[in-house]
C-alpha cells in the first residue's frame, strides 16, 4: 500500500510539471505576437497624420463676402455681392488671388421717382438687416436683407446680357412703405437697432420706432426767411427753399445738429427734450474760406461727427469746415 501511494504521488507531480511547462511555453509563444501587433498599429497610426498635413498645405484660402447696395436717379435699387479672398490682407500674397468677383443679388425699380438716400440697420439675432430707402416721392421703403452671403443655385437661370452672374437671395423681402413726410426725403439713419431718423424737405426730422414703425417724436425746424435768390434755387414763385439737407447725431445720442436749405447756419438740438439748443451762424469769412462764392447759397450740405464726438465737420458745395467742441472753428 505504501509503495502504490508513492507511485501515485510521483505520477501526479509529473502531470503538474507537464502542465506548468506547457503553460510557460504558451505564454512565451504569445508574447512575440503581442509585440508584432503593437508595432503594426503604431505604423498605421502615423499614416493619417501625414495625410492631414498635406490637406492643410493644399487647402484654399477663405473668402469674404461684402454686400453693396446703390440707389440712382433712375429709381433703381441695385444690390450686388463682392467676394474677396482673405489673402488681400497679406502683403506677400500674389495679386492675381486678390481680384474680387462680383455677382448681382437684386435689381428693380424701388420708387416712382429718384432715390435720394439709403440707410442700413445693425444686424439682429437672425443675421438680418433692415434697408430703408428715401425718395422724392415722399415715401420711405423698407426691405429685409440677409447678411449671409448668397448661395449659388444649381437650377437653370434665364439668359442675361450682364457680364456678372446673378445670384438671388430668397431671404431678402420687402416690408412696406412709410408715409412720415409730406415732401422729398433727404436723409435716413439708424443710430441704433430700435430707432430710425428721417429728414425731409418739409422741414421736419421724424424719429420712428423700428418695432412697429410708429413716429415717436417729430422735430420741426423753422422756415427760413427769404433773403435773395441763391444759385440753384428750385423754389416756386413766391416761395422760399425749405427742407433739412442733413443731420448728424452725437455718439452719446443726446445731441443732434442739422443744416437746411436757405440757411447760412447750423442748428443744435437736444434729443432728450426734443427742443432747440442753439444756432451757429456761418460768417462771410468762413464761407469764403470754404470756397463759397458771391452767388452761392452758403448753406450746409453735409454733416458728420468724429468717432470720439469731440469734432464735427460741415460740408459745403465746394469745401468743408471742421469744428471742435471747445473752439469756434
What are these regions (language model features)?
Residues 1-65, 100:
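Intrinsically disordered, Lys/Arg-rich low-complexity segments
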Residues 60-64, 118-128, 182, 188-194, ...:
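Loop/turn segments within WD40 beta-propeller blades
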Residues 78-80, 140-145, 188, 205-209, ...:
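WD40-repeat beta-propellers
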Amino acid at each position: 500500500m505504501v509503495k502504490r501511494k508513492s507511485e501515485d504521488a510521483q505520477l501526479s507531480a509529473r502531470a503538474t510539471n507537464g502542465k506548468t511547462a506547457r503553460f510557460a511555453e504558451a505564454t512565451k509563444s504569445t508574447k512575440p505576437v503581442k509585440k508584432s501587433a503593437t508595432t503594426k498599429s503604431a505604423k498605421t497610426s502615423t499614416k493619417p497624420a501625414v495625410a492631414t498635413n498635406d490637406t492643410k498645405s493644399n487647402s484654399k484660402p477663405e473668402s469674404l463676402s461684402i454686400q453693396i447696395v446703390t440707389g440712382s436717379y433712375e429709381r433703381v435699387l441695385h444690390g450686388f455681392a463682392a467676394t474677396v479672398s482673405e489673402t488681400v490682407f497679406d502683403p506677400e500674397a500674389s495679386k492675381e488671388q486678390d481680384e474680387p468677383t462680383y455677382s448681382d443679388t437684386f435689381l428693380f425699380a424701388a420708387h416712382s421717382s429718384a432715390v435720394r438716400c439709403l440707410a442700413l440697420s445693425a444686424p439682429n439675432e437672425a443675421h438680418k438687416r433692415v434697408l430703408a430707402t428715401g425718395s422724392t416721392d415722399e415715401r420711405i421703403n423698407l426691405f429685409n436683407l440677409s447678411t449671409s452671403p448668397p448661395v449659388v443655385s444649381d437650377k437653370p437661370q434665364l439668359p442675361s446680357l450682364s457680364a456678372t452672374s446673378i445670384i438671388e437671395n430668397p431671404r431678402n423681402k420687402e416690408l412696406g412703405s412709410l408715409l412720415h413726410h409730406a415732401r422729398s426725403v433727404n436723409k435716413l439713419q439708424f443710430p441704433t437697432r430700435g430707432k430710425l431718423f428721417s429728414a425731409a424737405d418739409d422741414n421736419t426730422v421724424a424719429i420712428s420706432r423700428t418695432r412697429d414703425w410708429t413716429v415717436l417724436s417729430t422735430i420741426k425746424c423753422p422756415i427760413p426767411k427769404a433773403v435773395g435768390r441763391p444759385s440753384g434755387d428750385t423754389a416756386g414763385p413766391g416761395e422760399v427753399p425749405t427742407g433739412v439737407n442733413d443731420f448728424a447725431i452725437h455718439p452719446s445720442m443726446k445731441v443732434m445738429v442739422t443744416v437746411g436749405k436757405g440757411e447760412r447756419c447750423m442748428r443744435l438740438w437736444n434729443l432728450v427734450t426734443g427742443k432747440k439748443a442753439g444756432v451757429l451762424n456761418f460768417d462771410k469769412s468762413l464761407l469764403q474760406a470754404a470756397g463759397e462764392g458771391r452767388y452761392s447759397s452758403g448753406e450746409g450740405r453735409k454733416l458728420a461727427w468724429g468717432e470720439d464726438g469731440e469734432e464735427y465737420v460741415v460740408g459745403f458745395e465746394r469745401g468743408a469746415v471742421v469744428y471742435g467742441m471747445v473752439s469756434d472753428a
